[in-house]
Amino acid sequence: MCIRDSANAVLHGFESSDFDNLTMYSEVLQDSAIELLDQGKLAFASASSITVSKPVYDKILANIDHYRERIVLRPQEISNAPEIVRRLGIIGINTALEFDIYGNVNSTHVGGTHMMNGIGGSGDFARNAHLAIFVSKSMAKNGDISSVVPMVSHVDHTEHDVDVLVTECGLADLRGLAPRERARAIIQNCVHPSYRDALQDYFDRACQRGGQTPHLLEEAFSWHQRFNETDSMQPAKSPARKAA
């Protein structure tokens, strides 16, 4: 499990779920993991570090005997060890800044150049987990940015390491799918309606040129260029975007 808002939102979702007696094998534990431990949803958690808010930090220290039975901290070379991740059969959940219609994921660089955060152990978990899931909001900046684009501006995780993509609009299970099948699943299930028609149009026109993984290279980064020029990936201001 990676850290960031989307991943924490997923953990908070377990609070009202039917899941119980969960175990977590992660790189970092945050507030949401401690809350799940307190509620009994999470039975045990393993990580290399704990990064929590001051109130949660104070609670852990005040109840250290309680938490030492439920949390273990291991060196990073163990918590992120590919062989261990693979052997445990982990369901890996990581956060994507953006992903493209074929399933390539950018986890670290805004606009392809400005680093927002490091990659951490997400590569170790994505490649070796039994099921590699990436989660993201479908849009950012009040709808001015689509998290799903024709081609990602930076690649941290290739399409070969991504099993499932999830946004609030739905999920795309990419396992066993050819590139064009992946694109159709992503556009249909993960893209916000404000951007879906434009992305479908890009894909349809790219398919007319043929190829295993169709692209329009002259337009592949046009969405990022449009944002740099107009502060929005949308061709025009729209009430739908502002309401999102």
Q: Which residues make up each language-model segment?
A:
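Short, small-residue-biased leader/transition segments that mark boundaries at the very start
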Residues: 1-3
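Conserved phosphate- and dinucleotide-binding cores of soluble alpha/beta proteins
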Residues: 5-244
